[in-house]
Design a protein with these regions (language model features):
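C-terminal accessory segments
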Residues: 277-313
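Right-handed parallel beta-helix
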Residues: 66, 93-104, 119-133, 145-161, ...
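Extracellular beta-strand solenoid repeats
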Residues: 38, 46, 68-70, 81, ...
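Extracellular beta-strand/beta-solenoid scaffold signature
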Residues: 51-58, 79-88, 104-116, 131-143, ...
Length: 313
């Protein structure tokens, strides 16, 4: 079921989503429905609901609904200003975001899950993220299972700005994330751990064709799977400068596999270094065109990292 939001709608709350879901349920006679919400190009939406006492509340996906938030084609992506978090409680085959710009305007976390949830796929495709104070995905309570988190063709800039929480944070032992897959994406400036786990990711973390810069703050980890077996696979990826020489690499009892990838000379991990992934002789400034100003176009001919930055042939 595809529904294009009327241009007059500028706030997406529980009522807006529930009305679309209810209409689809009535039309199909089924509880479990799949809907695509078309968002107007260039439109800015405030993502917030209202609690019974009148205060701001999280935006909830109704039970049984699988939802795609889809940015319609146009001059610019629709902007989702997250005033509060996304609540994924309940059972959902998938929750997807496609071709949208995501901003933290008060939510701190995109997802800060404290209630039971079972999700097949949580995915972000062709999206930009900027200025999130804390995590994109955090679990803090309840029993949460997600088969796969996918980030594809995205750019995340200035993440974990508060310095208190990782970008991806499995924060409870009652979380079962089977797979974390990051591909064709850029991660520019992370002011905490990039990945931190209190429960292993059973199917591992796969990072392919990605570009990292200003990755990981001092004393924080690229991936912290302490005393847990989470396999890490990195393919055709460029690790640019670390934010601090006291940044840390990876700790896991799982395997670390590196293929066809490059690590800049100024990607320094003062401890827990990724010994399978030695730093090369080139600095970030020698690899990228103007990394300090977010231009990661490759100066070198290697076709690795996020494909959007390949040197023109």
């Amino acid at each position: 079921e595809k529904v294009e939001l009327d241009p007059s709608i500028t706030t997406i709350n529980n009522d807006v989503i529930a009305n679309i879901v209810t209409a689809a349920q009535e039309k199909t006679g089924k509880t479990n429905v799949a809907i695509t919400i078309g968002l107007q190009a260039g439109q800015t939406y405030t993502m917030v609901s209202t609690a019974e006492d009148g205060t701001d509340a999280n935006v909830k996906i109704p039970e049984g609904a699988s939802v795609t938030f889809f940015g319609l084609a146009g001059e610019s992506k629709p902007v989702l200003n997250w005033k509060k978090c996304l609540d994924i409680a309940g059972s959902h085959a998938y929750i997807r975001f496609q071709n949208v710009s995501m901003k933290d305007t008060g939510c701190q976390y995109l997802i800060n899950q404290d209630k039971d949830a079972a999700v097949g796929e949580l995915s972000f495709t062709d999206c930009t993220f900027s200025g999130f104070e804390s995590s994109v995905f955090r679990t803090k309570g309840g029993v949460v299972s997600v088969d796969k988190i996918l980030v594809d063709n995205c750019v995340m800039t200035n993440m974990s700005t508060g310095g208190g929480y990782p970008v991806f944070y499995i924060g409870t032992t009652n979380t079962n994330l089977v797979k974390l897959e990051l591909k064709n994406s850029t991660f520019d400036t992370t002011s905490h751990n990039f990945i931190q786990l209190k429960a292993a990711i059973s199917g591992g973390v796969t990072i392919s064709d990605c570009t990292f810069y200003n990755n990981v703050a001092g004393s924080k980890y690229f991936m912290d799977s302490n005393k847990l077996s989470t396999d890490l696979t990195i393919i055709r990826t460029v690790l640019g400068m670390s934010m601090d020489a006291a940044a840390k690499g990876v700790r896991t009892t799982g395997s670390i596999v590196i293929n066809e990838s490059m690590r800049a000379k100024d990607c320094v991990y003062g401890s827990n270094d990724i010994k399978e992934f030695a730093a090369g002789s080139l600095t970030s400034d020698e690899i990228f065109t103007d990394p300090a100003n977010h231009n990661f176009t490759m100066k070198i001919d290697d076709r690795i990292g996020d494909p959007r930055w390949y040197k023109a042939e």
